[in-house]
Amino acid sequence: MTPKIVCVAGPTACGKTTLGVLLARRFHGEVVSADSMQIYRGMTVGTAAPTEAEMQGVPHHMIAVAEPSEQWSAAEYVAKATPIVDDILSRGKLPILVGGTGLWMDALIRGHGFAGGHAGGEVRRELETRFDRDGIEPLLAELWQVDPESAARLHPADTKRILRALEVYLETGETISAHNAATRQLPPRYDAVWIGLQFADRADMKALIDRRVDKMAEEGLLEEVQALLAMGLPRNATAMQAIGYKEFLGVLDGTLTEQEALELVKLRSRQYAKRQLTWLRRNPAIHWIYWEKDRDFARALQISTEILTASGLG
């Protein structure tokens, strides 16, 4: 029988962390984070990583497990998180996946579907050298020759996925589109019960995101960016491109005032939340809970408990 896990998903600032903890306490679970930025050490403020108090004694996994200089893909996340989920299950506990990185959540549930090739290996370095020298156009033209399906799907600005598609083909002889099509037919590794959180009124979500960004500034986001630079983290590191960090680099460079940076972080956070919702709404398995003016966690816990109990958990 496919083991069951719970997924708590939603856009930034919607209360996933709190509901995940409440469900873990109710169902004897442990939280596994699925946030592509909370994996990094030294970035607790800008990623809104849960504090010890917010964890309420519930074990949390996959938070602050990587150096900010590292670059993780969904494949690396799955490789690290799967043994943790399996260990939680082996101890009779319920894994509760919490996060806003929908691709990583889907990938962990599938448990397969990653094309071969050694991401970051010699082939990737050669492709990156060519990209730095010649730009993306010749590489995209090459992708059209070997994998037209991927080339047609990818925007020229999506250089990361263009390089990855070429890397897979050059290392394995198989196109990434063919590989993905084949693996979509395979059964998932886990049977996921999805709980989704979002606001009924987008204006309420906007207000909450704005308050969260202000709180990050008060808690020392600028100082966190300075600390990362002081430890030698390059400005072009993936971690530094996260919302909040990139903008506050501008403050340190003198190209933005702190207030301008804050407004830009708020705008980009709202845009990111919209993209998160677009991704998640494609998933028909999600049981959505809609917040009204405020986030009523007692009500959300009650609804979630009913959903999980009906799914055979509890």
Short names for language-model regions:
Residues 1-314:
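Phosphate/pyrophosphate-binding catalytic cores of soluble transferases and nucleic-acid-acting enzymes
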